């Protein structure tokens, strides 16, 4: 059993907790504490009720600065400085760093100084972390001495396994990506001030282009893809589930049937449970609460001139990513204990 703490109980933090309680990993992972500046009553309410993922299936209550879920008592903390958190006292193996604002090694080391053994960041990080992992592709890079690890981003986890399969079978020459991402909490409900002028506009009324570093994220996981990809991203007025429009030029000649067959075989083999494949006529809400990192929509595969391939990928940008946080943390402990 590994003892974990969640720092930051927002969309991803709560999804991690819910994903754990809906999975078979509860016999291996125990959430010991949650650090969040919000009031306990609000934390309880947002655990019980969720607009996107529905009601929590287990009874939850507060008792003496603990959140009680079934027979589990999770300590609630409200400390703004990670260095002051009682991780040593609580014997924390891994901190899930889910605030969204702590993303470099120096900031994460505050958790280590407080007594945590390792930190897993729930978003892209600076280059000074020990490793950036996309589960299913490069978790074998984890080493016992790694203390600060990034789980990359939901979109990187969605697209990299598919690029990896295409490259191994057909040799990817170059690619272009459009991420069609649900609205996020860094946007405005109605027009209001933001450093990004496009994000001053109401999230529910427009398709809003935003900056993305997805192409650089691909390079970090697949270094041989350096300078081969470019990406743009738009936010759309939905609350969850993201689509990715992926176009790649391949060195080998292909057709639609071959591309779909290879991708489907990968989902039944090495990427089982991580990448899915569908030929059903589905829409974005059909992938809500899907635990996989990526689902290839085979009905939308297109091939031009035998070498240019266009794919449509789906992912639940909250739930799929939260499940990968659990998977990566187990791999971190496995690497640490195998030394």
UniProtKB/Swiss-Prot annotation:
Gene: epd
Native species: Shewanella halifaxensis (strain HAW-EB4)
Site (Activates thiol group during catalysis): 181
Biological process according to GO: glucose metabolic process; pyridoxal phosphate biosynthetic process; pyridoxine biosynthetic process
InterPro entries: E4P_DH_bac (IPR006422), GlycerAld/Erythrose_P_DH (IPR020831), GlycerAld_3-P_DH_AS (IPR020830), GlycerAld_3-P_DH_cat (IPR020829), GlycerAld_3-P_DH_NAD(P)-bd (IPR020828), Glyceraldehyde-3-P_DH_1 (IPR006424), NAD(P)-bd_dom_sf (IPR036291)
Quaternary structure annotation from Swiss-Prot or TrEMBL: Homotetramer.
Root EC class: oxidoreductase
Protein purpose: Catalyzes the NAD-dependent conversion of D-erythrose 4-phosphate to 4-phosphoerythronate.
Record pathway: Cofactor biosynthesis; pyridoxine 5'-phosphate biosynthesis; pyridoxine 5'-phosphate from D-erythrose 4-phosphate: step 1/5
Pfam families: Gp_dh_C (PF02800), Gp_dh_N (PF00044)
Any coiled-coil regions, as ranges: none
Name recorded for this polypeptide: D-erythrose-4-phosphate dehydrogenase
């Amino acid at each position: 059993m590994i003892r974990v703490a969640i720092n930051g109980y927002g969309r991803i933090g709560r999804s991690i907790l819910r994903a754990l309680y809906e999975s078979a990993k509860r016999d291996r992972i125990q959430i010991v504490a949650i650090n969040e500046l919000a009031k306990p009553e609000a934390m309880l309410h947002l655990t019980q009720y969720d607009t996107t993922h529905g009601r929590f299936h287990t009874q939850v209550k507060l008792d003496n600065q603990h959140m009680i879920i079934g027979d589990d008592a999770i300590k609630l903390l409200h400390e703004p400085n990670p260095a002051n958190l009682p991780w040593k006292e609580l014997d924390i193996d891994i901190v899930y760093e889910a605030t969204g604002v702590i993303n470099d090694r120096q900031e994460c080391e505050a958790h280590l100084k407080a007594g945590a053994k390792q930190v897993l960041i729930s978003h892209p990080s600076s280059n000074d972390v020990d490793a950036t992992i996309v589960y299913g592709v490069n978790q074998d890079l984890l080493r016992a001495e790694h203390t600060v690890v990034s789980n990359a981003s939901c979109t990187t986890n969605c697209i990299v396994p598919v690029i990896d399969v295409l490259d191994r079978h057909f040799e990817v020459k170059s690619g272009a990506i459009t991420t069609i991402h649900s609205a996020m909490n860094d946007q405005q409900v109605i027009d209001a001030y933001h450093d990004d002028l496009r994000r001053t506009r109401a999230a529910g009324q427009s398709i809003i282009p935003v900056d993305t570093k997805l192409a650089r994220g691909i390079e970090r996981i697949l270094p041989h893809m350096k300078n081969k990809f470019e990406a743009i991203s738009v936010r759309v007025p939905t609350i969850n589930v993201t689509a990715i429009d992926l176009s790649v030029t391949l060195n080998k000649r292909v057709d639609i049937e071959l591309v779909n067959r290879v991708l489907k075989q990968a989902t039944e083999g090495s990427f089982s449970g991580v990448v899915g494949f569908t030929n059903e006529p589905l829409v974005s809400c059909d992938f809500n609460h899907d635990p996989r990192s990526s689902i290839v929509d085979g009905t939308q595969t297109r091939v031009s001139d035998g070498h240019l391939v266009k794919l449509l990928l789906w992912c639940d940008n909250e739930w799929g990513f939260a499940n990968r946080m659990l998977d990566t943390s187990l791999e971190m402990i496995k690497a640490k204990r195998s030394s």
